[in-house]
């Protein structure tokens, strides 16, 4: 059974250069990395399957790379190897569709306090963030307003209109496009 893998995982882009149909996003993120002008909170918005989570992972790996090649990760340093092997302690993912309670957010907030051991940043990717309960959003707000210097949040959603305004106002918002046939050719 280990010979089989979901094609979306096998062919998922691993670099900014390999992301399809989102050049406006990837070039902006690459510029931020190269200039050292990183925000503490990002909101990636767009339909399912357009690369929001993929770009979040690529970005998280790139900003933690110890020997970056411009804005791309080297894939050779300890930080990149641990990410590629699924054992990075700096990158945390939360699926808010199934972990949307105040307690889930409090657990995440406890992790925010931990300083990264390898790499520069602790990156928290919250997928389907619009599914958080109102109480969970409110519990998260203080941390999003005043994060530690080592913490970066990347929130991803298919439904931006469900995100409370106080969260929206604290994020750099990136709107992902639908991928067109000509983008993939």
Residue ranges and their predicted role:
Residues 1-173, 177-185:
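P-loop/Walker A NTP-binding region and its immediately flanking N-terminal helices
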């Amino acid at each position: 059974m280990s010979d089989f893998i979901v094609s979306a995982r096998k062919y998922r882009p691993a670099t900014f250069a390999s992301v399809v149909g989102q050049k406006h996003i990837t070039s902006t993120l690459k510029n931020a990395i190269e200039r050292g002008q990183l925000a503490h909170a990002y909101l990636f918005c767009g339909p399912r399957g357009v690369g929001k989570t993929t770009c979040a992972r690529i970005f998280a790996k790139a900003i933690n790379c110890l020997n970056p090649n411009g804005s791309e990760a080297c894939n050779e340093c300890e930080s990149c190897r641990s990410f590629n092997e699924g054992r990075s302690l700096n990158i945390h993912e939360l699926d808010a569709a199934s972990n949307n309670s105040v307690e889930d957010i409090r657990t995440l907030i406890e992790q925010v306090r931990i300083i990264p051991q390898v790499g520069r940043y602790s990156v928290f990717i919250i997928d389907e963030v619009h599914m958080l309960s109102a109480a969970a959003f409110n519990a998260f707000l203080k941390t999003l307003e005043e994060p530690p210097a080592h913490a970066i949040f990347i929130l991803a959603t298919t439904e931006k209109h469900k995100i409370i305004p106080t969260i929206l106002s604290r994020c750099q918002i990136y709107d992902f496009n639908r991928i067109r046939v000509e983008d993939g050719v």
